[in-house]
Regions:
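Generic N-terminal amphipathic, Lys/Arg-enriched alpha-helix
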Residues: 3-17
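Residue-level signature of catalytic and energy-coupling elements of molecular machines
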Residues: 27, 88, 133, 215
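Short, charged, intrinsically disordered terminal tails
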Residues: 1-3, 225-233
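Long, charge-patterned amphipathic alpha-helical coiled-coil/hairpin "stalk" segments used as oligomerization
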Residues: 93-198
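Flexible glycine-/small-residue-rich
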Residues: 47-49, 80, 118-119, 176-178, ...
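Flexible, glycine/charged-enriched surface loops at secondary-structure junctions
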Residues: 39-43, 200-212
Length: 233
């Protein structure tokens, strides 16, 4: 069943040549010409990947620092004690603690965007799997959120490091900034994300990996991006 689209979306869709594939810079320029909204939309690069999400050895997951940040204020929670806890606080983490924070999360506290933990804390933090897991907040060594260097992890997240993960349909969607960003900043953030997703290609993936790439804003249609420049990374 066709979804009811807003007048703004339909106006943007009429401007877009859906048969055309743009280089990234032109795709961003096209996106920025769409009718503005009353709020600062998030801009997202979305991928359709040639992998089988049912196969554990074809999982695509990783992190990417955005050269120009995400434009979002990220609230960070850190499970740590001692010097690691002190370092996290000094780096700007909003919530730092151990047993008190674990209990708080068990009671339903979710007012944060990223959770970081020291390796020593993980024995206790794993008990929160059913709470943090469904929201994608469980600390993980592969995304740099399980580390003894809590200060560095907090600083990177605050500066605009984004995480990406393959969904059950074989897609990945990564925010690359805000609609208010300059075109150059959005293009450079987008380029960094595309390169990161390409480098995260599983060794077991066969055939074409980047089946489709689009860039869109919260209330806009997707603009197709040419994946050709990234195929030999």
């Amino acid at each position: 069943m066709q979804r009811n689209r807003s007048k703004r979306y339909r106006a943007a869709a009429q401007q877009l040549d859906r048969s055309k594939i743009y280089n990234l810079a032109d795709a961003v320029s096209t996106l920025k010409k769409f009718p503005p909204t009353k709020f600062d939309q998030t801009v997202t690069v979305s991928f359709r990947l040639g992998v089988d999400p049912k196969q554990s050895d074809q999982m695509v997951r990783g992190t990417c620092p955005l050269p120009h940040g995400s434009g979002k204020q990220v609230r960070v929670l850190v499970f740590a004690e001692g010097e690691a806890a002190k370092a996290a606080k000094e780096a700007g983490a909003e919530f730092v603690g151990m047993k008190d924070l674990i209990q708080k999360c068990q009671e339903g506290f979710q007012d944060f965007d990223v959770a970081i933990a020291t390796p020593a804390a993980m024995a206790e933090v794993r008990k929160l799997g059913k709470v943090l897991g469904p929201r994608g907040l469980m600390p993980n060594p592969r995304t740099g959120t399980v580390t003894d260097d809590t200060a560095k992890a907090v600083q990177e997240v605050k500066a605009g490091r984004v995480e990406f993960k393959l969904d059950k349909n074989g897609n990945v969607a990564v925010p690359v900034g805000k609609f208010s960003f300059e075109e150059k900043a959005l293009a450079e953030n987008g380029n960094a994300v595309i390169e990161a997703v390409v480098r995260a290609r599983p060794a077991t993936a066969k055939g074409r990996y980047l089946e489709g790439v689009t860039i869109s804003a919260t209330m806009s249609p997707g603009v197709r991006v040419d994946p050709a420049p990234y195929l030999n990374i």
